[in-house]
Amino acid sequence: MKAIELRHISKAYGPIKALQDVSFSVDKGEIFGIIGPDGAGKTTLFRILTTLLVPDAGTALVEGFDVVKQMRKIRPRVGYMPGRFSLYQDLTVEENLKFFATLFGTTFAKGYNSIKTIYSQIEPFRHRRAGALSGGMKQKLALSCALVHEPSVLFLDEPTTGVDPVSRKELWEMLLSLRARGITIIAATPYLDEVRKCDRVAFLSDGQVKGIDEPEIILQHFKDVFNPPPIVQDTSSRTGASQGNNLDKDENVITVSHLVKAFGKFRAVDDISFSVRRGEIFGFLGANGAGKTTAMHLLTGLNQPTSGKGSVAGFDISTQHEQIKKHIGYMSQKFALYDDLTVSENIRLFAGIYGMKGKEITHKTDELLSKLQFIDLKDSLVASLPLGWKQKLAFSVSIFHEPEVVFLDEPTGGVDPATRRQFWLLIYEAAARGITIFVTTHYMDEAEYCDRISIMVDGKIKAIGSPEELKHTYNQPDMDYVFTLLARAATRT
């Protein structure tokens, strides 16, 4: 008997065909990957297999039980870890585990041995609220919650999105140990190194299975999607070196000197100093909990430093918050768009927030819709857009007012490789106009696209330089190895 068997599964949301005639099977004890571009139907497929959605047509079996007719038989047998972690932020670590155990008719005490190896890494923090955990710790807690009732099949919908490379490696070490215990694992991932850890992979696109095979065969066959050509930079067109921009590429638009942010005795940001030039793409890297987000909040005027100095676009970060906000753009991990407004309404709203006026807003809105090829979508709710399209819109809105600096906080999390490359072309275009890019990312291939990089560990900047300089200094072949080498020395969790 197969662990999973699908026969001609289809699912539509009104006119949108999320899944069309999907058929495949998964062997027991297999790590089976589901990959594909944004909007391919991956999450819909997971929800059907975990009995959260009913298919419109076809049959799906989990451990031999029908997902429609035998839901109650299936639910105790499956664990599900959605992409955004289904944790209750105001409950403690231990309270979350007890809650999920109760949902599945068991107790935390009974399930403890099945999660002991994973849970032991966060058990010292069992009384801490889930919302106060780092990304890596949330990931371990979410996995523990999905396993506390001892399921035989585990579904993971992009579980490592927004998590640093070290935590991703740790998760996959855990998954390999689960497979050794006979647990079947079905995982969706946008990371190519994770795809290669699967036994087999299904490529899903436009709601259809386009191919199923070993990872390397699938990646080669669909290389245009998963291995698009590397971005070739024309560095002469950036940092104001050409195009008649007359920009001073040596002018520092961000300057930080001995910056500290303490919460009681805990120093989230611990004496950091650096500068960023006009038109530079500066990668601000660090493991989860290293202090990146806190530092970014200081630079954008969202928080006050405990000590030290800093300026952004010529304004003091301690005393001139409002001036800074007028000269920067900001794009968060969640894109900061309003899902219940249309594309056009979102653009106009943010234009107004940035102080733009009537005719200018109308002209630039039309210009942006045309550039993004969103003219036919201008009256569509943002909630209806695929993730990659939301990403492009959010970035375009964040630089709509031509700020001197734009802060991008993990802007490509959960987006497929081809869409990420397209997004970076937008970044290069903005940098060519003299906009300074300050970006955090957990994708180390993106780190290679930056002019310079800093790597934070335990609140301090441990390394800073160009990708080539850092690889040479630490004698490593790529930025993934450099990052892992430095981040593994962290003492914070």
At which residue positions do the language-model features occur?
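Conserved ABC transporter NBD signature motif
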Residues: 58-66, 74, 308-316, 323-324
